[in-house]
């Protein structure tokens, strides 16, 4: 896997839309994956023999323009979710500093453990709304996919999910790479 042509953070400024208001959503089955209410990690694990998390980078960063207006600095974690060694999803998580010290979650010690396992195993983290975004074939996400030897012929899609813990909020963005879309069509 060669991702050396880009550097952490890979994310870019994105226009997210409420799933109810998003026009021209992709056709099934990608649409169902984008709108799935449960754990994406669990859903992905059901499609492979070997699931793994490859960390692209993590650290304290300023959020991108419009990404997290209430925060000057957040903990950013960017990973690839791989099924049988093939990257399916690029995930970008933003965690406010105030949540990093919560006893319910060791975000800094996650390593290659999937974040979804942690969030969906804790009652104190409540899944919130899902927003949708589409990415052009010249976006940074498309460049990342191409650096992974995945040909980008069509626009790419992703979702952003809010998770609430007490009065705090964090975001998990999951963008589907071309290999995932192709595999979904065969499921």
From Swiss-Prot:
- An MF annotation (GO) of this entry: chorismate lyase activity
Q: Does the keyword rRNA-binding apply?
A: no
Q: Name one GO biological process term.
A: pyruvate biosynthetic process
Under Pfam families, the record lists: Chor_lyase
Pathway involvement of the protein, from the record:
Cofactor biosynthesis; ubiquinone biosynthesis
What Enzyme Commission number(s) appear in the record?
4.1.3.40
Q: Which locations, inside or outside the cell, does it occupy?
A: Cytoplasm
* Binding residues annotated for substrate, in chain numbering: 77, 115, 174
Which reactions does this protein catalyse? chorismate = 4-hydroxybenzoate + pyruvate
Q: Gene3D superfamilies from the xrefs? A: Chorismate lyase-like
Supply the alphabetized keyword list. Answer: Cytoplasm, Lyase, Pyruvate, Ubiquinone biosynthesis
Cellular component GO terms, alphabetical: cytosol
Q: What does this protein do?
A: Removes the pyruvyl group from chorismate, with concomitant aromatization of the ring, to provide 4-hydroxybenzoate (4HB) for the ubiquinone pathway.
* Family assignment from sequence similarity: Belongs to the UbiC family.
Enumerate the PANTHER family for this protein: CHORISMATE PYRUVATE-LYASE
Q: What is this protein called?
A: Probable chorismate pyruvate-lyase
- Say which species the protein is native to: Shewanella sp. (strain ANA-3)
């Amino acid at each position: 896997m060669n991702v050396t042509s880009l550097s952490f953070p890979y994310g870019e400024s994105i226009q997210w839309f409420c799933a109810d208001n998003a026009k021209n959503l992709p056709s099934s089955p990608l649409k169902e994956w984008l709108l799935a209410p449960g754990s994406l990690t669990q859903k992905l694990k059901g499609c492979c023999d070997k699931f793994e998390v490859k960390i692209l980078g993590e650290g304290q960063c300023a959020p991108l323009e419009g990404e997290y207006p209430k925060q000057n600095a957040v903990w950013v974690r960017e990973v690839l979710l791989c099924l049988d060694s093939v990257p399916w999803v690029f995930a970008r998580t933003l965690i406010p500093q105030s949540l990093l010290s919560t006893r319910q979650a060791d975000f800094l010690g996650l390593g290659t453990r999937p974040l979804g396992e942690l969030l969906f195993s804790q009652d104190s983290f409540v899944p919130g709304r899902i927003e949708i975004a589409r990415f052009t074939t010249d976006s940074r996400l498309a460049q990342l996919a191409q650096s992974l030897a995945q040909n980008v012929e069509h626009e790419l899609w992703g979702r952003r999910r809010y998770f609430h813990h007490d009065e705090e909020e964090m975001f998990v963005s999951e963008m589907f790479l071309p290999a995932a879309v192709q595999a979904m069509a065969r499921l």
